[in-house]
C-alpha cells in the first residue's frame, strides 16, 4: 500500500474514546497515525504500547539493593560471592570431594597392581589409571564449584587403599573390575545424596550442577563397567583375560 507523502499526517497524541459506561477501552495506547490512500480512502492506524508491567511490579534496582540480604560483606574472611548457599550444601560438596578423591586413590592402587612386572596387564593398568585421573578431575571440579558459590573447601582424610587384588576363584582381573563396578555405584549413591541435599535446601543451581556435570556420566560409567564384568565372566581366568587386556590397551 503506497502512501502519498504530502498527505500523510503527523503523529498526534492519543485521546481514548470512552466505551459503554464511560470506561476507556485501552488506557495504555499512546499514539495514533492517520494516512490517506488515493484508492482506499482515509485509514487510521493506532499504535499501542503498554505502560503497565504485566506482573504489576516495576523493577526498582536502587531501592531493592538496599535489602539486608544483598548487602556486600565488609568483614574479613567472608565470601563476597556467597548467596543462598546453605551450610548443609557446603558440607555436602566437601564430603563429595572426599568421595571422589578416595575413589581416585583406589583406582590408582589398581593401576599400580596391574602395572607390576609379574602381573603385566597393561590394558587394565591403563584403564584404572585413566579412571583415577577422572575421579581426581571430578574432585577438582567440585572444589572449583565450592569456591564459585562462596564456600570453603575442607579436605578430609583419605583411607588407605589395598595393594593386593588377587582372588583365587575369580582371578585378579574379574575381581578388580567387580570392585570398580561396586565403587562406581557407591559414588553414584553419594552423588544422589548431594542432589537431595540441594533439593532439601531449595538450591536449584547446585542441583543443576550435579545433574549436568556428574549424574549422566556416572550411569554411563556403570553401564560400561557392567559390560566389562559380564565379558570377563565369560572368558574366565585363562587366555581370554590377555585378549581382553589387549582390547583395553587399544
From Swiss-Prot:
The family this protein is said to belong to: Belongs to the ferritin family.
GO terms (BP aspect): intracellular iron ion homeostasis; iron ion transport
Name this polypeptide is given: Ferritin-1, chloroplastic
Tissue expression: Leaf > hypocotyl.
Reactions listed under catalytic activity: 4 Fe(2+) + O2 + 4 H(+) = 4 Fe(3+) + 2 H2O
Keywords, ordered alphabetically: Chloroplast, Iron, Iron storage, Metal-binding, Oxidoreductase, Plastid, Transit peptide
UniProt-annotated binding residues for Fe cation 2: 135, 184, 218
Record EC number: 1.16.3.1
Coiled-coil annotated spans: none
A Pfam family reported for this protein in Swiss-Prot or TrEMBL: Ferritin
Function text: Stores iron in a soluble, non-toxic, readily available form. Important for iron homeostasis. Has ferroxidase activity. Iron is taken up in the ferrous form and deposited as ferric hydroxides after oxidation.
Residues that bind Fe cation 1: 100, 135, 138
